């Protein structure tokens, strides 16, 4: 089981779709060697060094957290069922209402659209919010995603810069 890393007062909570098998086996988020999450959040400015999956709890030192839409591990996120994403979206809203981070970053456009019953959304900041929490949709850092690392860093950096401009 991959546990959430959450606390009140975070700048951002990154929300993955669901754990891959590497994460399920180790208990650490974004654990597959091909997953670029740890590299991307470092290069985008969220951490002062590249953390390892087993150091996930240290995200709290940088006022960052992680959660997921669906607890069930799969080989690919495409194996997650629509009803799981919808249920996960409802559960995620409750978590965000409880912890009230400045921003929620859902990592994947299709997962966001299905989990939040939205259509035709763009990358970046969304029109909806959860209380005072800004909602962003960023590309998923999975190694299965063909987007170049530089583009991932650029998208994540846009969120980091928006938080800095907000005084966070």
From Swiss-Prot:
EC number of this enzyme: 3.2.2.28
Subcellular localization(s) per the UniProt record: Cytoplasm
GO MF, one example: pyrimidine-specific mismatch base pair DNA N-glycosylase activity
UniProt record similarity statement: Belongs to the uracil-DNA glycosylase (UDG) superfamily. TDG/mug family.
Subunit structure, interactors included: Binds DNA as a monomer.
Domain of life of the organism encoding this protein: Bacteria
Top-rank EC class of the record's enzyme: hydrolase
Transmembrane parts of this sequence: none
Gene: mug
Keyword Transferase: no
Catalytic activity: Specifically hydrolyzes mismatched double-stranded DNA and polynucleotides, releasing free uracil
Protein name from the UniProt record: G/U mismatch-specific DNA glycosylase
InterPro entries, sorted: MUG/TDG, MUG_bact, Uracil-DNA_glycosylase-like, Uracil-DNA_glycosylase-like_sf
Annotated function: Excises ethenocytosine and uracil, which can arise by alkylation or deamination of cytosine, respectively, from the corresponding mispairs with guanine in ds-DNA. It is capable of hydrolyzing the carbon-nitrogen bond between the sugar-phosphate backbone of the DNA and the mispaired base. The complementary strand guanine functions in substrate recognition. Required for DNA damage lesion repair in stationary-phase cells.
Gene3D superfamilies noted in UniProt: Uracil-DNA glycosylase-like domain (3.40.470.10)
GO biological process, one term: base-excision repair, AP site formation
Key words of the record: Cytoplasm, DNA damage, DNA excision, DNA repair, DNA-binding, Hydrolase
Listed Pfam families: UDG (PF03167)
The organism's taxonomic lineage, starting at the top: Bacteria, Pseudomonadati, Pseudomonadota, Gammaproteobacteria, Enterobacterales
PANTHER family the record matches: G/T AND G/U MISMATCH-SPECIFIC DNA GLYCOSYLASE, G_T MISMATCH-SPECIFIC THYMINE DNA GLYCOSYLASE
Any one Gene Ontology cellular component term annotated for this protein: cytoplasm
